[in-house]
Amino acid sequence: MTDDEMYEDYDVDDDSAEESGNESLDDTEYDDAATQEFDFDENQPQRSLGKLTRQKSFEVLNKDDLFSESHKIIKEVKDVLSIPSEAAVSTLLRHMKWNKEKLIERYMENPEKLCIDAGVPNVMKLNATIVEKSGNVSCLICLEDYPPTQTFALICNHRYCLPCYKNYLEIKVSEGPECIYTPCPAPKCKVIVHQDAFKQIVSPEVFERFNNFILKSYVDDNPQVKWCPAPGCIYSIRCDRKERKEAVNCKCGFQYCFNCNDYEIGDHMPCPCSQVDKWLQKASDESENVTWMLANTKKCPECRSPIEKNGGCMHMTCRKNAGGCGFEFCWLCRGPWTEHGSTTGGYYNCNKYDKSKAKEDDDKAHDAKTELEAYMFYYHRYESHRNAMKIADEQRRNAHLKEQQILSKFDVRSADTKFLMEATEQLLKNRRVLQYSYVYGYYLDKKSQERNLFEYLQEDLEKHTNLLSTQYEQSLDKLEDYQAFIKWKEQVTNYTRITKKFLDNFVDGVAGGLVNTQIN
């Protein structure tokens, strides 16, 4: 495994931290410090991260790696249980969700039951023996007669011609991953068509697809290995920790949370997974519609239909053409409009209001409206950075086009355009963190002292990220000559470095001072 296929976490070396004295955090290189457990004391200055030690924590796997691993497990089980056929062991492992230890245990307890349940009634012999006869064999599908050598049967002895068997297996493979559990074509037969039978009967292309589905089952059934969720990515990642907090980096370039394993979510630092789940549920939950209704409508006192006020007058009518009952009432106290006049303060006022139960209802509505406004504040900013992140991702993918324009206009070296990719990658990282920082901020205790630090660091990161975005998006048409290009390049390069420091400061602030903050 190459260094590129390994991602590394970092732990703080306390001794080196003491030696570093007041060394600035800005000059410290680190990846995922945001989720390290730090003790926060508001009366003490935050310590430097000091020297960072590396720990290998996850591994990127390609198809060859998966094949080697799965084949190694098959061979180990084969040797332990003295089963002669790897195809039989493969079928047993798939039945046991690739749990080697559990398979061996169950096989030792009751091998006959396990094998029957797995569709391998005889691990010593998988296929029926061809008996040479003077006559032909009748295929049970097409009912045509064939020489025995042109037919095939599993140990269950349900014999079919090779063309029919081939067609049956290819259809199963075309239907998807469940083909690895394909049973014998005979009705109600539970014997599984093993790997060697597929290899013998179908084309090499179809057999390769079948093997790919076996590798897929190896990943899908393994809690420590997951496919990278990026569209079109062929890699998987193994993580040896059950609840990994840091993001993982796939060789395809996508960075994401291993636990969530969701392309749309990606890397949700600084939020914990549970917080993201809660936020996404809130965003899609119908209860939010109920909150809006409570905050912005009142129910007709007669038929209880929700009514939204669209004018200044307190005289409300529950419109029949909108499904109402026609009842006329006061918006403030919800009493009949016939009881309102000069004695109650006039038609545009109501001095009954404070004495009515409507006051209690309106207090609840006011609280709901306040909560809704707070949610919308954070949600709009979450969405804004989410959209900006998509733009940054597109800019990163199109950086080579801007590079070609620069090379052709200013006759510079290819190395002089490296800053473009660095800037877009930094923008992408910043936007992703800013997106989820508003989720984190929404659930942060409104009265906590740490909130001020959080919002201060968030504001700094947001401001300088926007400045870098503005610098990067400058039109090349405005760069009149080589000197103008060099000046622009220096500005973008410097701001890329600056925004990285602000991102690092934000990450360190969350890790060092906010991880123990009470979350509502």
Curated annotation (Swiss-Prot):
Binding positions for Zn(2+) 3 per the UniProt entry: C228, C233, C250, C252
InterPro entries given in the database record: Ariadne, ARIH1-like_UBL, E3_UB_ligase_RBR, IBR_dom, Parkin-like_IBR, TRIAD_supradom, Znf_RING, Znf_RING/FYVE/PHD
Residue spans, zinc finger IBR-type: 208-273
Keyword Nucleotidyltransferase: no
Annotated catalytic residues: C313
Alphabetically ordered keywords of this record: Metal-binding, Repeat, Transferase, Ubl conjugation pathway, Zinc, Zinc-finger
CC terms in the record's Gene Ontology section: cytoplasm; ubiquitin ligase complex
Family of the protein in this entry: Belongs to the RBR family.
Binding positions for Zn(2+) 5 per the UniProt entry: C300, C303, C318, C325
SUPFAM superfamilies, sorted: RING/U-box
Name of the featured protein: Probable E3 ubiquitin-protein ligase rbrA
Annotated zinc fingers (RING-type), start-end: 139-189, 300-333
PROSITE patterns, alphabetized: TRIAD (PS51873), ZF_RING_1 (PS00518), ZF_RING_2 (PS50089)
Annotated region described as TRIAD supradomain, given as residue ranges: 135-354
Consequence of gene loss (knockout): Prestalk cell numbers are reduced in slugs and these prestalk cells do not localize to the tip of slugs. Development terminates at the finger or slug stage, and these slugs do not phototax, possibly because the tip region does not properly form.
Residues reported in the UniProt entry to bind Zn(2+) 4: C257, C260, H268, C273
